[in-house]
Design a protein with these regions (language model features):
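N-terminal, polar/charged subdomain of small-to-medium soluble alpha/beta proteins
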Residues: 1-101
Length: 101
């Protein structure tokens, strides 16, 4: 998995990078390819810390944006949202394959 982290008004520390790497492993299990690109943007908007994530794999794109007081909570919520989107996409894709048999 290729992960690119960008910080706007926030610095992407090693702790944040390691946390994102660890959480991104949950996404990796849904795909059998290594060609997964995860783009993460962390920024500060008002009093909130925003995590924006976008995954592109096999021509598909998934996106999540979450804001909260805690950056780590925003990252967790984004991963949960992305995981739900990917599960829904895979279920829809496999059900269409079975319908065509």
């Amino acid at each position: 998995m290729n992960i690119k982290i960008t910080g706007k008004e926030l610095k992407a520390t090693d702790a944040i990078k390691n946390y994102i790497d660890t959480k991104a492993e949950r996404i990796e299990k849904y795909f059998d390819t290594e060609d997964i690109n995860l783009f993460v943007t962390i920024k500060k908007e008002g009093g909130d810390q925003v995590a924006e994530m976008q995954i592109s794999v096999n021509g598909e794109s998934f996106r999540a944006v979450t804001a909260s007081n805690d950056l780590y909570a925003s990252i967790d919520k984004d991963i949960d949202i992305l995981e739900g989107q990917i599960r829904k996409w895979k279920l829809k894709r496999t059900s269409k394959i079975w319908q065509n048999l």
